[in-house]
């Protein structure tokens, strides 16, 4: 029987197996940020240990940064965490993309753009959305603070091998429908627990024509379906993306030959298989308090089925049967590790070009990294956004989570390109609706959701 991509990635990294069936995996890249690392570094100090492989560790500042003025950090805890990371990286000789550095940005944006993320690697980070890097054919997953310390000290991690889920995507997406809509559709149909105990492998004709930044969006939200990770077999698009980046292998051709072996064999069998035809897929909007509570833009909100639905409707201030077009939007956030890359900003800019944000709507664009921001400004995107009435911010996690000054006021609705819509995720009482960058941009213009497919704009990603 053939091997799945998961099998090949896993087997390449097993150091040993213990009597309980746990495998000790070697970790190729450890990404670090200011929130989940302080206790881990302190643990090293208390035991008089060092970081085993500083050269395989890379840190950045992202979660706590105030994106309006990155140098004016007024929150005491945020400043302490940022200062602590800076001191820890200096003491343990870990490379750091500090505030103002050209490499700084959201950890899951800078990894790929710097070439740190590569096919075949095991990648961990103390952050749920580490699965993003799986778009490159890497086995990438989030870990807890105690595991962060373990990896810092040993460059290994004890893990039980997950099962493999194959998700075949076939068909061609309509204009105005994106990877964000695919994953929201998957979650709405199968729920937030469908991937529990699995690694999701996305494959099929839709994936083959999808660009790398869209693939990252898919893998980023695999965790929202309960999966350990999301992966996509690397191909020519992957190799072209990695080649020439700062931390890409110097002996690139040798690595590329190894990367070509990273695919699921034709006779391999997945533990669970799902097939989705995306041809008739529509833009999605979440209405509730987890990412599976979503509907097509042309559907009414569902009826209540259980106490969770009842609580979600109450929290969100919505009613069953309500039209998605009638959901008010007071805030728009275009950013996060899900949708803050250059192509995301280009799409949003094409929607708002020459138009104005609806009066009473606060709209933010937060590039995912300094490099994304600079590239967008070279293209003049910041002028398009600012002339339309958007705020153009510095890179950081921003309004994705209520951990910095960028928050949604209690009881108000936000069209967000982020990945989670939990209660209080964007601030106490904030009401979050997950959408694609195109849908978020359009909502800013109208003050409510509209069907982006009916809008005239030139921001469709080419799937030719």
UniProtKB/Swiss-Prot annotation:
Reaction(s) this enzyme catalyzes, per UniProt: (2R,3S)-3-isopropylmalate = (2S)-2-isopropylmalate
Gene Ontology biological-process annotations: L-leucine biosynthetic process
Enzyme class, broadest EC rank: lyase
Domain of life: Bacteria
One Pfam family here: Aconitase
Cofactors, names only: [4Fe-4S] cluster
Cofactor note: Binds 1 [4Fe-4S] cluster per subunit.
Entry annotated with the keyword Iron-sulfur: yes
Pathway: Amino-acid biosynthesis; L-leucine biosynthesis; L-leucine from 3-methyl-2-oxobutanoate: step 2/4
Signal peptide positions on this chain: none
UniProt keywords, alphabetically: 4Fe-4S, Amino-acid biosynthesis, Branched-chain amino acid biosynthesis, Iron, Iron-sulfur, Leucine biosynthesis, Lyase, Metal-binding
The keyword Metal-binding is assigned to this record: yes
InterPro entries: 3-IsopropMal_deHydase_lsu, Acnase/IPM_dHydase_lsu_aba_1/3, Acoase/IPM_deHydtase_lsu_aba, Aconitase_4Fe-4S_BS, Aconitase_4Fe-4S_dom, IPM_dehydratase_rel_enz, IPMI_cat
EC number per UniProt: 4.2.1.33
Chain sites annotated for binding [4Fe-4S] cluster: 337, 397, 400
Single GO MF annotation: metal ion binding
Quaternary structure note: Heterodimer of LeuC and LeuD.
Family stated for the protein in its record: Belongs to the aconitase/IPM isomerase family. LeuC type 1 subfamily.
Role of this protein: Catalyzes the isomerization between 2-isopropylmalate and 3-isopropylmalate, via the formation of 2-isopropylmaleate.
Full protein name: 3-isopropylmalate dehydratase large subunit
Organism: Bacillus cereus (strain 03BB102)
Protein encoded by which gene: leuC
């Amino acid at each position: 029987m053939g091997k799945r991509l998961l099998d090949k990635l896993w087997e390449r990294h097993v150091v040993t197996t213990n009597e309980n069936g746990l495998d000790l995996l070697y970790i190729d890249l450890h990404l670090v940020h200011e929130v989940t690392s302080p206790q881990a570094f302190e643990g090293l100090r208390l035991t008089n240990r060092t970081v085993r492989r500083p050269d395989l560790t890379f840190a950045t500042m992202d979660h706590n940064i105030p994106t309006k003025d990155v140098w004016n950090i007024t929150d005491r805890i945020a400043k302490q965490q940022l200062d602590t990371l800076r001191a820890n990286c200096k003491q343990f000789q870990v490379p750091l993309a500090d505030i103002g550095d050209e490499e700084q940005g959201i950890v899951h944006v800078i990894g790929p753009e710097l070439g740190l993320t590569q096919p075949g690697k095991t990648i961990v980070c103390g952050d749920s959305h580490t699965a993003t890097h799986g778009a490159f054919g890497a086995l990438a997953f989030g870990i807890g603070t105690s595991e962060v310390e373990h990896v810092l000290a040993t460059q290994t991690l004890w893990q039980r091998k997950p099962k493999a889920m194959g998700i075949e995507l076939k068909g061609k997406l309509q204009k105005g429908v994106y990877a964000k809509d695919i994953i929201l559709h998957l979650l709405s149909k199968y729920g937030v627990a469908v991937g529990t105990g699995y690694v999701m492998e996305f494959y099929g004709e839709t994936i083959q024509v999808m660009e790398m930044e869209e693939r990252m969006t898919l893998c980023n939200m695999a965790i929202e379906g309960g999966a350990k990770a999301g992966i996509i077999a690397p191909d020519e698009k992957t190799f072209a993306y990695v080649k020439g980046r700062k931390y890409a292998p110097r002996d690139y051709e040798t690595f590329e030959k190894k990367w070509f072996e990273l695919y699921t064999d034709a006779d391999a069998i997945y533990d669970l298989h799902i097939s989705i035809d995306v041809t008739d897929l529509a833009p999605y909007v979440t209405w509730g308090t987890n990412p599976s509570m979503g509907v097509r833009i042309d559907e009414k909100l569902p009826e209540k089925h259980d106490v969770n639905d009842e609580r979600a409707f109450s929290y969100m201030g919505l009613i069953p049967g309500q039209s998605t077009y009638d959901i008010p939007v007071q805030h728009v956030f275009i950013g996060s590790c899900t949708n803050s890359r250059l192509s995301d900003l280009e799409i949003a800019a094409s929607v708002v070009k020459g138009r104005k944000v609806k009066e009473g709507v606060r709209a933010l664009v937060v590039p995912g990294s300094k490099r994304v921001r600079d590239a967008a400004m070279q293209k003049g995107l910041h002028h398009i956004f600012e002339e339309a009435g958007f705020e153009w911010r510095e890179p950081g996690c921003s309004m994705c989570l209520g951990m910095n000054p960028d928050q949604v006021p209690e009881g108000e609705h936000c069209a967000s390109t982020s990945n989670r819509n939990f209660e209080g995720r964007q601030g106490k009482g904030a009401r979050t609706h997950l959408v694609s960058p195109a849908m978020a941009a359009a909502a800013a213009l109208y003050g409510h959701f509209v069907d982006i497919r009916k809008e005239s704009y030139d921001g469709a990603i080419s799937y030719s």
